[in-house]
Amino acid sequence: MNKLIAWIEKGKPFFEKISRNIYLRAIRDGFIAAIPIILFSSIFILITYVPNVFGFTWSKTMEGILMKPYNYTMGIVGLLVAGTTAKSLTDSYNRKLDKTNQINFISTMMAAICGFLFLAADPVKDGGFSSAFMGTKGLLTAFISAFITVIVYNFFVKRNITIKMPKEVPPNISQVFKDIFPLSAVILILYALDLLSRAIVHTNVANAVLKVFEPLFTAADGWIGVTLIFGAFAFFWFVGIHGPSIVEPAIAAITYANLETNLHLIQAGEHADKVITPGTQMFVATMGGTGATLVVPFMFMWLTKSKRNKAIGRASVVPTFFGVNEPILFGAPLVLNPVFFIPFIFAPIVNIWIFKFFVDVLNMNSFSIFLPWTTPGPLGIVMGTGFAFWSFVLAILLIVVDVIIYYPFLKVYDEQVLEEELGNKEANNELKEKVSANFDTKKADAILATAGASEADTDDTSSVDETTSTSSTDTISEQTNVLVLCAGGGTSGLLANALNKAAEEYEVPVKAAAGGYGAHMDIMKDYQLIILAPQVASNFEDIKQDTDRLGIKLAKTEGAQYIKLTRDGEAALEFVKQQFNN
């Protein structure tokens, strides 16, 4: 098993390169920007259709009133994502351009939205246009519009093809004329594509694209498709790669289209049979976090003999219940641990097989409601599928099955740890260092340390490689703003908080903030230093183009080093100081 994992890790650079692809990243970040709209609209689905389960049905008039906010938000999500995706892709292209010759992201957003209307909207007799393909049905077309828009803009801006204005003309006026050529080219190209589609296949581009990808959508919803998709999430995470960065952009259009299709099927009184949805990913395949780990902390707490494992279980129960499973992933650890390779990969797959059986054979409705990913898995299953009877059975069954899958491997691992404890050996040092080098383990480490489950020696927190100094914090004399970036923005808060606390204690002019990689472009100019957490350290060369252009210092950290910095605020301040001395 160790040889298998070592062989798998050899492919890590290739997959990391895929995860940094600017087009995949644009899709992911475009969706992230639209999440508030999607969450808001789902509230009205719950209000409108959940009462049906209890025998209460709204009148058609009231149903129309309640669903209007949904139709006017989620109903145009394709239109909105065209703009947000274009904005994200524009940021990526601007990294490669001279700082005095940048693409105007506001212009690309407007052009992508206008172009999307050409590709997805049909005129209606009374004026205006149909919105049938402006929602999730138009997502693939939204990506096409965004990509073509930014590529065309890059062509014009890079070659400085523009209407040149005298230097006396204000910059905002010059920008208007600079955008005329690329915007016109985008509209004409996408309009020509629309005319071509209507002439050849007699429908708009959005509908034509859906027809082309329909077999793929069907295949993805099949047994092999769901196995590959949800197995990949766990596989990539196990070997140290942020799986969602690779898998989610590839299936985003399918999942959200299926979610809306399921809703329409329920509205029509039919069976909602589309399996691949956001809820399937969040509450079935990754119930309790990647690896379907909801049951694992409870098993560590109740079914192990090792004191260390019991402590880790107690510390991990609450966060894992809400889908934050870093404490058990990195505390046990589960990832990069040969003992847990099989259950970590196959528990999500078995979960999705059971769910598909319930949908296909028992005629249970699939997910039709979008819920926050922090919703506890069993509750997410019940709420997301409309409180159906079978959803309660499914939630209980998945818990039982996951316990059965993990149990034999847990016993093997517990015996290993127990033997080490009885022999006064330091447990799994090599494995823990490997995990720290491959993952951003700061959140897990902090939670475990607080709960008394960490085995880290206190001396570790006072020797942060080359960053410790007891007299250097007073050398930072000017106001220094620091931005800490991680994959999602949540866990980077630990280092930011450590810096702020130490800065206040030692009266050092340092202010730190946490953020997520991909959402940093608009705010990074306000900082003098950006620190990359280990999870996003592979993006160092990409972001360095931005920081060099803006005159900002950039630093990346490794796993063990980062953990120690989050524990020792003084060492974190010294780390900041050293970046300006290098």
From Swiss-Prot:
The modification Phosphocysteine is found at C486. The EIIC type-3 domain forms the PTS system translocation channel and contains the specific substrate-binding site. It comes from Staphylococcus epidermidis (strain ATCC 35984 / DSM 28319 / BCRC 17069 / CCUG 31568 / BM 3577 / RP62A). Keywords: Cell membrane, Kinase, Membrane, Phosphoprotein, Phosphotransferase system, Sugar transport, Transferase, Transmembrane, Transmembrane helix, Transport. It is found in: Cell membrane. This is PTS system lactose-specific EIICB component. The phosphoenolpyruvate-dependent sugar phosphotransferase system (sugar PTS), a major carbohydrate active transport system, catalyzes the phosphorylation of incoming sugar substrates concomitantly with their translocation across the cell membrane. The enzyme II LacEF PTS system is involved in lactose transport. Its main location: membrane. Residues 464-473 have a biased composition (Low complexity). Coiled coil: none annotated. It is a multi-pass membrane protein. It catalyses: lactose(out) + N(pros)-phospho-L-histidyl-[protein] = lactose 6-phosphate(in) + L-histidyl-[protein]. It comes from the Bacteria. InterPro entries: LacE, PTS_EIIB-like_sf, PTS_EIIB_2/3, PTS_EIIB_3, PTS_EIIC, PTS_EIIC_3, PTS_IIB, PTS_Sugar-EIIC/EIIB.
